[in-house]
């Protein structure tokens, strides 16, 4: 239940700040189907490697971003708006390389792309359904994300 709109949300952005400015905002999480998010992320990966173009980013910008990700410090940081894994305990889990960029969402969504290994993972969840006021929901998703990523890595290795 959204406190601002005073109803359950379905099929619309849940991020309050994005909603306040019209529903589309770069900081907000992922909104779409897992297939659609995965296909767009795959096009970004190809774009990073100069193999194609993306509707959302030019090849030049993608390759510049990839070079920044390769030089990102070992501690968690951001690369042109993308998150990088934090050492020690990252929502990406323990198997993504330091040449990885990703994005997390308020509702528990997650996208990580390993630019070197060309592996991407998408998790779409709604931890705030039906009510964001459950105190365990944020701790639960922080625990769950790396568990899912680690298990997928174990399955594909």
Language-model features, listed with the residues they occupy:
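Catalytic loop of the DD-peptidase/beta-lactamase superfamily, centered on the K-T-G motif
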Residues: 1-157
């Amino acid at each position: 239940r959204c406190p601002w709109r005073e109803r359950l949300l379905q099929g619309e952005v849940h991020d309050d700040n994005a909603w306040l400015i019209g529903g589309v905002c770069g900081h907000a999480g992922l909104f779409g189907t897992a297939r659609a998010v995965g296909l767009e992320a795959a096009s970004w990966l190809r774009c990073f490697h100069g193999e194609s173009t993306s509707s959302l980013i030019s090849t030049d910008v993608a390759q510049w971003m990839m070079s920044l990700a390769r030089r990102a410090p070992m501690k968690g940081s951001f690369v042109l708006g993308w998150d990088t894994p934090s050492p020690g305990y990252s929502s990406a889990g323990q198997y993504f390389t330091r040449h990885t960029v990703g994005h997390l969402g308020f509702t528990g969504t997650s996208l990580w792309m390993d630019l070197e290994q060309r592996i991407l993972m998408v998790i779409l969840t709604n931890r705030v359904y039906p009510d964001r006021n459950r105190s365990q929901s944020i701790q639960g998703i922080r625990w769950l994300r790396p568990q899912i990523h680690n298990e997928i890595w174990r399955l594909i290795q």
